[in-house]
Amino acid sequence: AESPSSKTGANTGDVAQSNLTTPKRSVDKMTSPTDHALTRDSLYGITPEPTYGGMLSFMRRRYTRELSNVDVAVMGIPFDLATTARPGTRFGPRSVREASACLAWEEKVMGWGFNPLDDLAVVDYGDCFFDSGDPANAPQAIYECARDILATDTTLLSLGGDHFVSYPLLRAHAEKYGELALIHFDAHSDTWAEECERIDHGTMFYHAAQQGLVSPAHSAQIGLRTHNDQDHGFHIFDAPAVHDLQPADLAAQVKKIVG
């Protein structure tokens, strides 16, 4: 009798093994269409990846904390414990990375005619860690994260986070570069005078000016729509002034202030 294993036919569901064989395909992990945050072999240029999939990093840059020969490190600061109103900016770094995936495939940036990623070695450094259950130590943790990156002579691009994170970042930058010129886009001045140094997203630029981290005479605050009796020496372009000025004229004035 014929053994069951030797039968072929529509009723048995058995098909010759040769018909089941799928040709093997070699996939080079460095040219795979996804997860360039982990697999890209160059710090320069772009490599198209589906905007809807793959591991997210800023502009699909490589995830790494190795900063040798790196021009720019992008670091997230998921902190919003200083806000006095609606929280949620702790999700900012993740959201910016997700949005950046929609721009990471363009060979040339509209209006520029070139792509800065062709000339700059940019990496995603990941997020600065701090214990959310110990908020008093968060400013020091943010400062140390920034300090360690700057110590390698790498430029730091930070993703917040509420406004307060600017203060420990300014501390780290001023320690390395000296007094800074600040260009600040906001609806509020964040220079409310308060002598105690509590964690607050409305006082950090007051403290930065008082401590010599920034030079108000070489700093501009742009788009303010709330009143503050004291400007503390900052150059202010309020919202009506910004609406009246052409963007190129505003940029020229800010450049002159910064020097």
Regions found by a protein language model. Give the residues of each.
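N-terminal acidic, proline/glycine-rich, low-complexity intrinsically disordered segments
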Residues: 1-2, 30
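Conserved alpha-helical scaffold segments that buttress catalytic/binding sites
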Residues: 31-259
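Extreme N-terminal basic, low-complexity initiation segments
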Residues: 2-12
